[in-house]
Structures are given as C-alpha cells and as structure tokens.
UniProtKB/Swiss-Prot annotation:
Protein name: Minor capsid protein L2
Naturally occurring in which organism (per UniProt): Bos taurus papillomavirus 2
Any single GO CC term annotated in Swiss-Prot or TrEMBL for this entry: host cell
Single GO BP term: viral penetration into host nucleus
Function: Minor protein of the capsid that localizes along the inner surface of the virion, within the central cavities beneath the L1 pentamers. Plays a role in capsid stabilization through interaction with the major capsid protein L1. Once the virion enters the host cell, L2 escorts the genomic DNA into the nucleus by promoting escape from the endosomal compartments and traffic through the host Golgi network.
Gene designation per UniProt: L2
Primary localisation category: virion
Localisation: Virion; Host nucleus; Host early endosome; Host Golgi apparatus
Lineage: Viruses, Monodnaviria, Shotokuvirae, Cossaviricota, Papovaviricetes
Residue pairs linked by disulfide bridges in the UniProt entry: 19-25
Modification comment: Highly phosphorylated.
Keyword annotations: Capsid protein, Cytoplasmic inwards viral transport, Disulfide bond, DNA-binding, Host endosome, Host Golgi apparatus, Host nucleus, Host-virus interaction, Late protein, Microtubular inwards viral transport, Phosphoprotein, Viral penetration into host nucleus, Virion, Virus entry into host cell
Family: Belongs to the papillomaviridae L2 protein family.
Subunit note: Interacts with major capsid protein L1. Interacts with E2; this interaction inhibits E2 transcriptional activity but not the DNA replication function E2. Interacts with host GADD45GIP1. Interacts with host HSPA8; this interaction is required for L2 nuclear translocation. Interacts with host importins KPNB2 and KPNB3. Forms a complex with importin alpha2-beta1 heterodimers via interaction with the importin alpha2 adapter. Interacts with host DYNLT1; this interaction is essential for virus intracellular transport during entry.
Length: 467
C-alpha cells in the first residue's frame, strides 16, 4: 500500500477569511490571526509589570539620560512651528546648568545654516497667512555668511511684433463644381440567336438594343496571322502506380528487403483468398507500394515454419508472397467483329433523302371565289394596322371584305368577314403614326424580309373576366 501524499495547507490568513463566518476554522488559526496565542499573552502580562518607556529605546540616545532632565531626544518640527533646533538646545542647557552639545557638531553653527531652520520665505507660508502672496511682500534672503550673491531684477520687457511679409490682400478663389449631364447607357445581349446583327447605335430615339460579339481568331481581329502549333501527345503512363509515391519504409517494415524476407513471386491470385492479420489497429495506413518490376500488386507476409518461445515470440524465416498485376498495354487497335453466317443482312438507311417534286403554285392565282370584290380598303405604309379575331356567330352587323395595298399596284385580297365567318379580319385604326423601335441597331421595317412583325400586328390577349 502506497503512502498517502501530504498536501500543504493553505495560508492561515486565507483560511481565516473563509472559515471565520462559517465557524469551521481549525483551533490554531483564530488565535494566530487575532494575536491571542500563548506568546502574545506572556508579552501582554510582562508589559503590565515592567515599564521600559524611560530607557529611550529607538531615540538615538543609547539609553543615556541627562541628570535631572529628559533624554537628549529632540522631536521633529511640526507644521506651523517656528522654533529652531538651536533654541531648543539652548533652553535645555540653561535648565540643566550644563551646555548640551553633540560631538562633532557645534550648536553655534546650526543657527546660521538655513537647511535646518525655517527661512524667511518659509515663515510666511503659514496656515493663518493669506492664500495670495504678492512678490513685493517677500523679503530678500540674506543667504549664508561668507557668500555674496548678487541678483539684478529687471521689470522692463521688450515685445516686438513681426508683421508678415507680402501683400496685405489675400486672394480668394471660388471653386464651383462642374455640372455633368446624367447619362444612362443600357445594353442587352441576346443569347442563342441565329443571326447576329452588327452594333450600330446612331440614334437615341425610343428604346434601343444591341448585340455585341467578339470573335477570337476571325477576320475581325485583322489579318495579322498567327503560328500554328501542332498538338503533341506525351507518353501515357506505363504502370498504374500513382505519381506521388509514398516514402519507402526501411528495415523490417520494408517487405521488399531481402535481408528480412524471402521474396517469392507468384502467379496464383488464390493465395490471397484468406488473408489474416494479427491486429489491424496497429497496422500502418494502407499505401500503394511499387515493386522492383515497376508494377502494383498484392503482397502478403507470413511465416510458414516457425518456433514459438515461451514469451510468445516467433523464430523462423519470413516469406513475402507477391502477385504483380499486369502492365498497361499499348492502345488497342480495332478488333474485327466476327459475323455469323446465320446473321441477316443489315438494311442501309440514308441520313439525307433526296427531296421530291414540289407543286408550284402561282401567287397571282386568286381563285374564283375572289374574282369579284364589291369593296376594298387601302392602308398607306406606316399606318397602324392590327389583326383582330371577330367571332361570326351572334354578330349582327355585316362587314365587307377588306383589301390592303403594300406600296405596290398589286391588290392582295383579305378574307371576307360576315356574320357566318370566323376568319380574322383587318381593322384599320384612325391613328396613322407608327412608333419607331430600334432592334439590334436597325429600324424595324414592317414590309422587308427580316421576319419581324410589328407589335401592332400581333394579337392582344384579353384577360378572361371571372363572374
């Protein structure tokens, strides 16, 4: 059984502060802090019986008391006292009938030294003196005998005012900020469009939009030419070993060491079917090891024949059995596919078929139903023309057939509109002003082949009112 370790107790004063109020202090703590021990009691009782106050302990007098008088101890001067040390010594000598003196320091010289006596300036600084002292009321100090120090005071003070050099007028510059016009530029890029129009923003009418494209290597960069660098294929890796190889272990931890292990290469992968290990907790982290052949494989270390000692040690040769994997071969060429004789022939399907004959129809052939037109409407170029669907059922008014000319003498009839017809009709607006809209830097032409319709020709969707 081990001896119990002795722990040092805390300080007595720390214990007293914590255990006094709780009343759990040890018996020796309170008397020591409050001064009530046996030694303290003996000193108190001895002080009552013996009086040592007249010995002059701690008064520099070494216990020598003058005959018929007080000890030679002169108290220090208190605040406001004007009694000098020489006067105290003279009065003490007159009372005793003997001249009191200190060895090596005559009392006559103490009267002339201003270091131990109050000077004339110190005598004026008294509690009953006024708080403000004027310089005229302070008398001049006579100084020490044998020294003459002359002081000449001059009350005249010369003050010279220096005027700045240069002109009196100071230039004041007024700085006003410049008024800048507020400009706001917006740019929209359309993705996935089949046609890229050039950027031509020459007008600020209405709403504009543009498309910016930068072609690298095209004609837009100029005919500066360039250098064609052929693509070089570097050699592919020959083994499956990673580039960052782990550090090779040394000594018995290196399985490829011929000093500790007998290297036995094998080609039978069934050797590793039943892998065992003693304790995986203390095994090193798995890492890919590259063998001498430059290939990655499976390894196993074991002792086929060994002698076990009483302490649990094994004595015998260690074998390192390794199964190396195959290397990465060259690029595999096209392997012909063997076709069985019973395989049916494959049908050839062309990807692009030749177009057939189309039926040509003349545009001037209007048909017999539009031979006679009772009435026609014409609309000038730039007029607001919109298409509207007018249901025929339940419509009481009869509207004639409308025809619109598009800047040419040829007449293109529109579909007739009647009470029993549901085909769309042309509705001519009274407003002949067409808004100008710029799309991709070009003004929209309603009658050109840009495949863009004017917004006024599009049908407007009406919201369905729910009852």
């Amino acid at each position: 059984m081990s001896a119990r370790k002795r722990v040092k107790r805390a300080n007595v004063y720390d214990l007293y502060r914590t255990c006094k109020q709780a009343g759990t202090c040890p018996p020796d703590v309170i008397p020591k802090v409050e001064g009530d021990t046996i030694a303290d009691k003996i000193l108190k009782l001895g002080g009552l019986a013996i009086y040592l106050g007249g010995l002059g302990i701690g008064t520099w007098s070494t216990g020598r008391v003058a005959a018929g008088g007080s000890p030679r101890y002169v108290p220090l001067r208190t605040s406001g006292s004007t009694t000098s040390l020489a006067s105290v010594g003279s009065r003490a000598g007159a009372a005793t009938g003997t001249r009191s003196s200190i060895t090596g320091i005559p009392l006559d010289t103490l009267e002339t030294i201003g270091a131990l006596r109050p000077g004339a300036y110190e005598d004026t600084v008294l509690p009953e003196a006024p708080a403000i002292v004027t310089p005229d009321a302070v008398p001049a100090d006579t100084g020490i005998d044998g020294l003459s120090i002359g002081t000449d005071s001059s009350t005249e003070t010369l003050i010279t005012l220096l005027e700045p050099e240069g002109p009196e007028d100071v230039a004041v510059l007024e700085l006003q900020p410049l008024d800048h016009a507020n400009w706001q530029v917006s740019n929209a890029v359309h993705q996935g469009s089949a046609y890229h129009a050039p950027l031509q923003l020459q007008s600020s009418i209405a709403e504009t939009s543009g498309l910016e494209n930068i072609f690298v290597g095209g004609a837009g960069l100029g005919d500066t030419g360039g250098e064609n660098i052929e693509l070089t294929f570097f050699g592919s890796p020959r083994t499956s070993t990673p580039r960052n190889l782990p550090q090779t272990a040394r000594g018995i931890l290196n399985w490829f060491s011929k000093r500790y292990y007998t290297q036995i290469p094998t080609e039978d992968p069934d050797v590793f079917s039943s892998q065992t290990f003693s304790n995986p907790l203390y095994d090193p982290e798995p890492a890919v090891l590259k063998g001498p052949s430059g290939r990655v494989g499976l390894s196993q270390v074991y002792r086929p024949d060994f002698i076990e000692t009483r302490g649990g040690g094994q004595v015998g040769p260690q074998l390192h059995v390794r199964y190396s994997l195959s290397t990465i071969t060259e690029d595999v060429e096209a392997i012909p596919i063997a076709v069985d004789e019973d395989t049916q022939g494959l049908a050839f399907i062309p990807l692009h078929e030749e177009p057939g004959d189309f039926e040509e129809i003349e545009l001037d052939d209007l048909g017999e139903e539009h031979a006679l037109l009772p009435k026609s409407y014409t609309a000038p170029i730039g007029s607001g023309v919109r298409r509207a669907l007018i249901p025929g059922q339940g419509f009481s008014a009869t509207r004639p057939t409308g025809v619109v000319t598009y800047g040419s003498p040829d007449m293109y009839p529109a579909s007739p509109v009647g009470p029993d017809s549901t085909s769309p009709s042309l509705v001519i607006d009274d407003n002949t002003t067409t808004p100008i809209i710029i799309i991709d830097g070009h003004t929209v032409d309603l009658y050109s082949n840009n495949y863009s319709l004017h917004p006024s020709l599009l049908r407007k969707r009406k919201k369905r009112k729910h009852a």
